[in-house]
Amino acid sequence: MTTITITRPDDWHIHLRDGAQLKDTVRDISRYMGRAIVMPNLVPPAIDTETALTYYDRIKAQVPAGSQFEPLMVLYLTDKTSPDEIRRAKASGKIVAAKLYPAGATTNSDSGVTDLKNIYPALEAMQEVGMLFLVHGEVTDSSIDIFDRERVFIENILSKIVADFPELKIVLEHITTKDAVDFVTQASDNVAATITAHHLLYNRNHMLAGGIRPHFYCLPILKRNTHQQALLAAAASGSKKFFLGTDSAPHAKDKKEAACGCAGSYTAHAAIELYAEAFESVNALDKLEAFASFNGPDFYNLPRNADTITLVKKPWDVPATYPLGDTNVVPIRAGEVIDWQVE
């Protein structure tokens, strides 16, 4: 039986939601992840230090006994985020980054940034104090095709931010295109990217060919196979610029299976197991540990986890649903088999 032991991984991009759903999302991600960067797009969003810290307390209250799981908090940037707020957040010791959501780009992004110039003072403060800048890299102009929104964002917006703030550490999150891979690869060492398991394992054919499969619908949307292969090559390349970020984003079953379904795929039930499948598919299991356990903390200037987990190649059946507060979520690979499991 094939087994691999790796340093305990972290998730550098996850949605834990809030309220009754929190106990279920925290249960799943804390099984073997040491830390997770927790997205702030709540209702209302975590736009200030106090809101982010009270959210931290709610998450910690749901961590199962015996788990050392630690949430790493993120400030939600708005047009009005001040340099002083950035300094307060950094001084808290628990908020490690601030997040750009272009207004309307994804779930609960209506409070997001309408003009990048509005956050330049905040970005200057972040560069000064060493706070990371996390980016949902899509334009929101309705005239831009949804499959092109990441590429256009990189060309028109991100390239300018990188030039204007050369000392700012930037994470282009959940990248989905060869364009993003190339940009991050060629940029300075201050630019990195997260890649999801579902963008490594799937492309838009899985979502659209032979019937619409709404649980694959996420933002940024799945792209064509050539982009999927570029992501796999980047993740398995050994480059320190790419690391694990699930973007696990639960929605109730009836919110996904609807005439106008929500964007987001749930992978926290089997995150590292799905990544193991992806890396095995390109004969790169030897590169999984760096991607999952080293590159993220190294980029964030945080210590690597000290303990390990062991993955065993032992297929198991994924339940059709998992509990999500007072409803259910349909996970990726629901009712099917995953080849790996954590011992």
Swiss-Prot record:
Gene Ontology molecular function: dihydroorotase activity; zinc ion binding
Chain residues that bind Zn(2+) 1: 13, 15, 99, 247
Cofactor: Zn(2+)
List of residues binding substrate: 15-17, 41, 136, 219, 251, 263
Biological function: Catalyzes the reversible cyclization of carbamoyl aspartate to dihydroorotate.
Keywords, alphabetical: Hydrolase, Metal-binding, Pyrimidine biosynthesis, Zinc
Active site: 247
Leading EC class: hydrolase
GO biological process per UniProt: 'de novo' pyrimidine nucleobase biosynthetic process; 'de novo' UMP biosynthetic process
Cofactor: binding details: Binds 2 Zn(2+) ions per subunit.
Gene Ontology, cellular component aspect: cytosol
Protein name as catalogued: Dihydroorotase
Phylogenetic placement of the source organism: Bacteria, Pseudomonadati, Pseudomonadota, Gammaproteobacteria, Alteromonadales
Family assignment from sequence similarity: Belongs to the metallo-dependent hydrolases superfamily. DHOase family. Class II DHOase subfamily.
EC number in record: 3.5.2.3
Sites where the protein binds Zn(2+) 2: 99, 136, 174
Quaternary structure, from the entry: Homodimer.
Catalytic activity: (S)-dihydroorotate + H2O = N-carbamoyl-L-aspartate + H(+)
HAMAP family: PyrC_classII
Location of N6-carboxylysine modifications: 99
Family matches, as InterPro entries: Amidohydro-rel, DHOdimr, Dihydroorotase_CS, Metal_Hydrolase
Pfam families assigned to the protein according to its UniProt record, in alphabetical order: Amidohydro_1
